[in-house]
């Protein structure tokens, strides 16, 4: 665990877990808020395992998730990244699910990130070979997309398990909450990826899609989003 310069009692609560389970938790602390990219790298370089798994706060994952991801990496030495499908849930239960591509190629970077970030497991060696997450304010909120692009540009590959082994808390009625500056960041990350991966010239037009999405009225964006992810069980 790493406390990113919190000003409340977060560090005290975290310390209780360390005291109770000293063999399971290590506590790191930033003296001031350094942001997600820096903090992810700090944890990455302190981690001792061969495989690095992520999970966001307030989310849930299947008890089988880690074993299934480990099995993929153990049985496929040419694979560096493994992620899974995700379900979305709120106070009323599960309302949607992603539909990931099982074997993403460079072309899958054209329109969106090819991997869900939160449920991923990655070989530490692959992280280190690309120097982890790029610490750049222009890549805030798109650090994962840029990371995957760096890895693919360096010859690494990944796969997606087509099972919803992870549940992300997300309001089904949420409007388009991404600030416009982060859409500019997304456009910038897409330009970098298109260049790094030597994608066809025509694909540069897709770099502007994050900006176009940001111009869509929130209520329309919300309808599109629900139609994209809503499950038949909802």
Question: Which positions does each model-derived feature cover?
Answer:
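Conserved nucleotide-sugar donor-binding catalytic segment
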Residues: 45, 103-181
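A conserved acidic beta->alpha catalytic loop
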Residues: 3-12, 32, 56
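The conserved acidic donor/metal-binding loop of glycosyltransferases
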Residues: 56-60, 85
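Glycine-rich, basic loop-to-helix element that forms the pyrophosphate-binding segment
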Residues: 30-47, 68
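Acidic helix N-cap motif at the loop->helix transition within catalytic regions
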Residues: 8-17, 60, 64
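Short aromatic/hydrophobic "clamp" motif used to bind/position activated sugar donors
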Residues: 52
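Non-catalytic, C-terminal membrane-associated alpha-helical segments of glycosyltransferases
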Residues: 173-234
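Conserved donor NDP-sugar-binding/catalytic core segment of glycosyltransferases
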Residues: 64-96
């Amino acid at each position: 665990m790493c406390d990113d310069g919190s000003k409340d009692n977060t560090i005290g609560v975290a310390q209780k877990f360390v005291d109770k389970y000293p063999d399971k938790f290590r506590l790191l602390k930033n003296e001031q808020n350094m942001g997600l990219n820096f903090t992810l790298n700090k944890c990455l370089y302190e981690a001792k395992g061969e495989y690095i798994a992520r999970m966001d706060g307030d989310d849930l994952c299947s008890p089988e998730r880690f074993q299934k991801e480990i099995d993929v990496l153990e049985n496929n030495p040419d694979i560096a990244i493994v992620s899974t499908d995700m379900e979305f849930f709120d106070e009323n239960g599960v309302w949607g699910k992603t539909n990931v591509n099982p074997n993403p190629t460079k072309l899958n970077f054209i329109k969106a990130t090819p991997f869900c970030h939160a449920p991923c497991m990655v070989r530490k060696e692959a992280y280190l070979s690309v120097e982890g997450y790029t610490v750049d304010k222009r890549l805030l909120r798109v650090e994962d997309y840029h990371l995957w692009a760096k890895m693919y540009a360096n010859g690494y590959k990944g796969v997606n398990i087509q099972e919803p082994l992870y549940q992300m808390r997300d309001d089904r009625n949420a409007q388009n909450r991404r600030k416009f500056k982060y859409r500019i960041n997304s456009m910038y990350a897409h330009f970098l990826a298109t260049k790094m991966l030597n994608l066809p010239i025509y694909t540069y037009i897709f770099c502007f899609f994050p900006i176009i999405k940001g111009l869509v009225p929130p209520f329309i964006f919300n309808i599109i989003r629900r139609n994209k992810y809503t499950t038949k069980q909802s």
